[in-house]
Regions:
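Conserved core architecture of multi-subunit DNA-directed RNA polymerases
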Residues: 1-493
Length: 493
């Protein structure tokens, strides 16, 4: 192999050192070098870059427990693989843990707190774990009694009595649970499960119907973005736009009220949209009121526009305090748009957090603390044990108190950012500056215009790629294409 030695004269060394970076530089950037020569000071246009990645995909769907039960009623092993009442009925009886009640009017034992024959309130009897006798006392034979016992019950009797009381044909499939997990093995009335099956709804562990959604913040909206008529918005209190002009067209910009919520109704989603689920939930509750409780209907919903103005409860998974919200419209996204206050009242923010919504009347009629699993955390978390009806900004999570509410940032802000100073070194109007004043509820400003909140990607590829392996392959392929991404770093994560 031939080697060629190239010799350069000394005066060319400077150029070669620059080209091949053979010498260490002085440590100044190109911009600093230009400014050292220029009479006009140039600013850094690019600023500071930060890298981000998707934490979790968007979500808006009905919550379903394992097996998709429609009622918190145990069918035991007799319910088969599907845990269905139809399979259990074919076996006539089922064996599981049930509470023991007695009807003094009919002189019969039952598993309900009200008699399925006469409708009168029954007496709850406790069971001694030693002598097996029923008693009203908390103690017997020197030990504590418990509120249930292992029983073989005639499932046909309870199912047929429910169908007769409701006066409707039996659904083809009604699914229960293998066994209840609450302390006293309290069960839901089968009538509720039959009506949920009719309306194709699923029950949650506390007896309610939940719709899970990704949380998204919003302070302003246009009527065209949420599909609500001008007259309806006026009825809800939106009479003027942010400039003080009377509301007349769907292009005007409105400031959302702190407890108003825009629900998701994405046409591209493979899951059922919020309007579909809540319409069916309203119809279920109306049937429950009329056929089970013998009361007049309340919602009378026929279209999604009929849902506008109705109240919901927002509840984060790790809390036990719900906040009242009011439906004012539907977006075409897969997220729950609401005021930052409303999310903060649930101790949540917008970094991929998830909340759920349930109808107020659903919680009032069907929620019971006695249904909750007897496990640490399950006894109190993700359950509407407390309900906040009026949102007070000073009482919500303090993270939102640091939210900027100005329409522009001063020059000092950009100079401070250039010098990497702390955010609190520059005075910018924030929520904490208006707490306790009228301005804490209205008059918020923003810095960037948005033509339509429904624009952009409404359904990411992550949602419809079928398998996890294909999702990972897609993520790595994207990382390989993006020059700013480190493929090895993405793979390591």
């Amino acid at each position: 192999i031939a080697h060629i030695n190239v010799v350069f004269v000394k005066e060319h060394n400077f150029i070669l050192n620059k080209i091949f970076a053979l010498q260490e530089t002085s440590g100044i950037t190109g911009l600093e070098h230009i400014n050292s020569k220029s009479l006009v000071k140039l600013r850094d246009k690019s600023g500071t870059f930060i890298g981000t990645r998707m934490g979790r995909p968007e979500k808006a769907k009905l919550r379903k427990m394992k097996g998709t039960p429609v009622v918190l009623f145990p069918v035991g092993r007799e319910g088969g693989r599907l845990r269905s009442f139809q399979d259990a009925i074919s076996k006539n009886t089922i064996v599981s843990d049930f509470p023991t009640y007695e009807c003094n009017e009919c002189n019969i034992a039952t598993i309900y707190s009200s008699c399925e024959l006469c409708g009168k309130k029954t007496t709850w009897k406790k069971v001694c774990v030693k002598c097996k006798r029923t008693t009203l006392e908390d103690k017997c034979c020197g030990t504590y009694t418990r509120g249930f016992r292992r029983q073989r019950i005639d499932i046909n009797h309870y199912f047929d009595s429910a169908i007769k009381a409701l006066n409707i044909p039996a659904p083809q499939l009604v699914k229960g649970v293998r066994g209840t997990t609450n302390k006293d093995k309290i069960v839901e009335h089968i009538s509720k499960g039959i009506l949920r099956a009719v309306h194709k709804l699923a029950v949650n562990k506390d007896g309610t119907i939940r719709y899970d959604m990704t949380e998204m913040g919003l302070t302003h909206f246009k009527p065209k973005e949420i599909g609500t008529a001008i007259n309806k918005l006026k009825e809800l209190g939106y009479e003027k736009d942010i400039f003080g002009e009377l509301l007349e067209n769907d292009e005007q910009l409105l400031e959302i009220l702190p407890q108003d919520v825009i629900m998701p109704s994405c046409p591209e989603t493979p899951d059922e949209t919020a309007d579909d689920i809540f319409m069916r939930t309203c119809n279920f509750i109306d049937d429950l009121l009329e056929k089970h409780y013998h009361l007049p209907k309340y919602y009378n919903v026929k279209t999604k526009e009929d849902l506008i103005g109705h109240l919901i409860i927002g509840l984060a998974p790790h809390t036990s305090a719900g906040i009242i919200g009011r439906i004012i419209g539907f977006s075409k996204t897969l997220g729950c748009f609401a005021h930052p206050y409303w999310h903060a009242a649930q101790r949540r923010n917008f970094d991929g957090d998830e909340t759920c919504a349930l109808l107020v009347l659903d919680a009032f009629l069907n929620f019971s603390r006695k249904y909750l699993p007897d496990r640490r955390g399950s006894r109190s978390m993700d359950a509407p044990l407390v309900l906040t009806t009026v949102l007070v900004p000073s009482e919500v999570d303090t993270e939102v108190h640091g939210m900027d509410i100005t329409d522009k940032y001063p020059l000092d802000f950009y100079r401070a950012a250039e010098q990497c100073k702390y955010p609190w070194d520059v005075k910018v109007l924030q929520v904490k500056d208006v707490l306790g004043k009228k301005e804490q509820y209205e008059g918020f400003k923003y810095t960037h215009e948005t033509n339509d909140l429904n624009a952009g990607v409404r359904l990411s590829a992550y949602k419809f790629i079928p398998t996890m392996i294909e999702k990972l392959d897609g993520q790595l392929d994207l990382a390989a294409r993006i020059r700013a991404s480190d493929l090895d770093g993405v793979a390591a994560l």
